[in-house]
Regions:
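Bacterial N-terminal signal peptides that target proteins for export
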Residues: 1-9
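Bacterial N-terminal signal peptides
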Residues: 9-18
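N-terminal pro-sequences and low-complexity stem/linker regions of secreted or lumenal proteins
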Residues: 21-427
Length: 427
């Protein structure tokens, strides 16, 4: 998400009647998957990364592995897309607001049928659970992410498609599904504070919004750099994780990158879960911050092209991505079985229509085809559906929609595969 938006009229009235969501059949057309690593990058459209000289690794990787070249994020802001990747729905949430932690008295947006938005402002997000109706996704967003008079509207999906609200949306994620069948998952969050994720909305890796500071504040805390952001850790918004009644689906599933049980230690030991959700910090994911130095400054302009980007921010994220992929390739789990790395950007740069919400998505598998350049129409729902199929899980919410395709061509097991086991991409 970028800066708060000015309020304009809603376009939801143009949408069709409600759809119906929940859990469906196990998707077919995907080989069995032992491990999946999803790496989430931020806020850059397809055309801003592809061909960008400041993203040499991502561009080489997209050619050496497999690439979805007709892949679309769903909506805005960031949290909405993160929820759609792991849960197949926005769950009535179209804001980056923090969770209403451990709130057992509030009513979910699913239950009330109301939509949590930035404009008009909404309270913190009630813990998601139960069933109900999610929010529709119009083709054009005239409200949440309109920040300048020169940007009267931004596109959702391709600027043409819309998604009606879905009744019987179930408030759960792929994490709930995995834990329910005895499989493991973890959300690896760079710069998560040592106190863990409970109640933490923002952190710099040590200090956070729940730190009990002394008075006066120590100098190093005068301007907290929000490197970790809960809006990039979607599992925290669900009651099942906040309550933690199942230890396999709780705060213990969240770890940082460094230290005991962190990402790099787990990769080195080979002790990784079936599903790893990996979120670099807000400098390394190319989101940017306003107080973390020039290399992490926000892009000066958002026009849908490479004009106006912060080249240092793009390069910083590209280096971070390279290091993550190398670490996964070096892990014992990459040597055996069927594993996949998926790199994607959550949404575009909020440039005005007619720029669309197209983003680059890279799929790297250790068991099958490589070099595939797919032009099939895919979305965040396609990705969830594909991963669920690979794990033998039923599709969830909008991942079950009839027009959502499984990414079979990018996950195919047959055909020649180059040996990328030593992490040679971009070296």
């Amino acid at each position: 998400m970028i800066r708060k938006a000015a309020s304009l009229g809603l376009a939801f009235a143009l949408l069709a009647g409600p759809m119906f969501a929940n859990e469906g059949a196990v998707p077919k057309g995907v080989p069995h998957l032992d491990h999946v690593f999803v790496i989430m990058m931020e806020n850059h459209a397809y055309a801003q990364i592809v061909g960008n000289p400041n993203a040499p690794f991502a561009n080489h990787y997209a050619k050496s592995a497999n690439a979805a070249n007709n892949y679309f994020a769903i909506a805005h802001p960031s949290l909405t897309n993160y929820l759609e990747v792991v849960g197949g729905s926005n769950f009535g949430v179209q804001t980056d607001n923090s969770p209403s932690w451990h709130d057992t008295t509030c009513l979910t947006n699913l239950a009330t049928g109301t939509v949590a938005t930035d404009v008009p402002a909404s309270p913190d997000v009630c813990p998601i659970w139960g069933t109900g109706t999610d929010a529709p996704t119009p083709a054009i967003d005239y409200t949440n992410e309109v920040s300048l008079p020169s940007i009267p509207a931004v596109s959702n999906i391709d600027g043409v498609q819309s998604i009606p609200a879905a009744a019987n949306t179930v408030g759960k994620t792929i994490g709930d599904q995995l834990a329910g069948v005895g499989k493991s998952w973890k959300s690896y969050q760079e710069n998560l504070p040592p106190t863990g994720p409970d109640g933490v909305n923002n952190a710099d890796g040590f200090y956070s919004n729940v730190t009990l500071f002394t008075t006066p504040l120590p100098a190093e805390t005068q301007s907290l750099i929000n490197l970790y952001a809960v809006k990039h850790n979607p599992f925290m918004y669900f009651r099942s994780v906040q309550e933690g009644l199942n230890p396999a689906n709780s705060f213990s599933n969240v770890a940082g990158f460094e230290g005991a049980h962190g990402l790099f230690e787990d990769l080195a030991s080979g002790n990784v879960p079936e599903f790893s959700f990996i979120a670099p910090n807000q400098c390394n994911d190319q989101h940017g911050r306003g107080n973390a130095g020039p290399q992490c400054d926000f892009d000066p302009q958002t026009v849908g092209t490479q004009v106006g980007l912060n080249p240092a921010l793009i390069y910083l994220g590209d280096l971070a991505l390279r290091n993550l992929v190398k670490a996964i390739h070096a892990s014992p789990v990459w040597k055996d079985g069927h594993s996949a790395i998926v790199v994607l950007w959550d949404e575009n740069d909020y440039s005005a229509t007619p720029n669309t919400n197209q983003v680059l998505t890279i799929v790297d598998i250790n068991y099958g085809v490589s070099g595939v350049q797919s032009s099939q129409p895919y979305s965040h729902f396609s990705l969830l559906k594909t991963i669920e199929g690979g794990f033998g899980l039923p599709c969830l919410n909008h991942a079950c929609d009839a027009n959502v395709k499984v990414m079979s061509d990018l996950f195919a097991g047959e055909g020649h595969r180059q040996d990328h086991g030593n992490g040679q991409y971009g070296e």
